[in-house]
Amino acid sequence: MKVVVIGAGVVGTASAWYLAKAGHEVTVVDRREGAGLETSFANGGQISPCHAEPWANPSVLPKVLKWLGREDAPLLFRWNRWDPALWAWGLRFLANCSRSRAEINTERTLRVALYSRACLGELRAETGIAYDQQVRGILHVYRDGAEFEHACRAAEVMIRHGLRRLPRTPAECTAIEPALGAVQGELAGGIYTPDDESGDAHKFTRELAALAAAKGVEFRWNVPIQSLLADGDRVAGLATSDGTIRAESYVLAAGCDSPLLARPLGLRLPIIPAKGYSVTVPVDNHAGAPLVSITDDEHKMVYSRLGDRLRAAGTAEMAGYDRMPNPVRNRLILDNARRLFPDGGDFDRAEPWAGLRPVTPDSVPLLGATPLRNLWLNTGHGTLGWTMSCGSGRIVADLVSGRPSAISMDGLGIDRFTSYLW
């Protein structure tokens, strides 16, 4: 079967890989000049099922109110503009903030994330792909005792659903990652997830695209997409700057652009862009930079060692499709990295970056079938696109091929939003 994949980020490229392995004739279309140059380019680097707790949970509302008006807020909503999609998304977000909904959404996200981590391990063993990976786990650190206790309760939900999470004392945290020694006295505790990983998502995407091309996948670069063309209950083609591309099936993996492409077809995807920030710091003192990936819960920032670089990333800014970096937020990340790892690298040579993540109100991706019989979704992964990329790609490849997914699809599709009135 001829299949077109729309988008060559880590999710779209993984989709192409698994579709090619299933025997399909695959074409990937992307407006950029190579793979993984937007959301996947300089993210936090974590393969993190441990981050399955959704943004919408009972504890987030007091925090959002506290953060209102602060440019340095970890989660910044710019509500002072009339954007019906943003306000509708916000109402759905509020509807998912109950404890029961948060646990349901944690299980759904974790189901995909654990499967994806296993798929990544199989792919790595099969191909030998290298991407500055560290298979050393992820350590969450907490300075506030109440936040640590809340995190331990949230960890129990994930443990029930199959994820190993281990509460640790401050001394145990620095034993796991000695580079935390400068802040041991500030810590209330930590939670270690030993089976999680980290690695360079852009390098992985670029290498996987090369492997996919060797399997016959065609990548069409520098081809802006204009629209999806419908014919009744099917997609008839993809209108691009380079003409119309036709196939038997289409996989929409265009990240934040997915709802823009779907809307003219009558398909409303509840996805909004969340701008994330990172800085990449050259490591000039290997003992001072962490090897275990770290999540600083207080500041909602993550740190991953990528070879001779330290990637620090975090915060989320709901500001529409504005891709321009906010220097205040990049500086915030850099300052926190310097405080946590004072000997971690040459902070004066840090490279700032900002990119948009496609976020759903419940933090669960949109996977699988749509009302259009030959259009499939692989989008809406939020901050966990790298984490869920391989599993999501394999799921969609199975469904396109007419095979059942290896995991339950319950609650992962667009149909879960049909009960809403907005």
From Swiss-Prot:
<dbReference type="GO" id="GO:0008718">
    <property type="term" value="F:D-amino-acid dehydrogenase activity"/>
</dbReference>
<dbReference type="GO" id="GO:0005886">
    <property type="term" value="C:plasma membrane"/>
</dbReference>
<comment type="pathway">
    <text>Amino-acid degradation; D-alanine degradation; NH(3) and pyruvate from D-alanine: step 1/1.</text>
</comment>
<protein>
    <recommendedName>
        <fullName>D-amino acid dehydrogenase</fullName>
        <ecNumber>1.4.99.-</ecNumber>
    </recommendedName>
</protein>
<comment type="function">
    <text>Oxidative deamination of D-amino acids.</text>
</comment>
<dbReference type="InterPro" id="IPR036188">
    <property type="entry name" value="FAD/NAD-bd_sf"/>
</dbReference>
<keyword id="KW-0560">Oxidoreductase</keyword>
<dbReference type="GO" id="GO:0055130">
    <property type="term" value="P:D-alanine catabolic process"/>
</dbReference>
<comment type="similarity">
    <text>Belongs to the DadA oxidoreductase family.</text>
</comment>
<dbReference type="InterPro" id="IPR006076">
    <property type="entry name" value="FAD-dep_OxRdtase"/>
</dbReference>
<dbReference type="Pfam" id="PF01266">
    <property type="entry name" value="DAO"/>
</dbReference>
<keyword id="KW-0274">FAD</keyword>
<dbReference type="InterPro" id="IPR023080">
    <property type="entry name" value="DadA"/>
</dbReference>
<keyword id="KW-0285">Flavoprotein</keyword>
<dbReference type="GO" id="GO:0005737">
    <property type="term" value="C:cytoplasm"/>
</dbReference>
<feature type="binding site">
    <location>
        <begin position="3"/>
        <end position="17"/>
    </location>
    <ligand>
        <name>FAD</name>
    </ligand>
</feature>
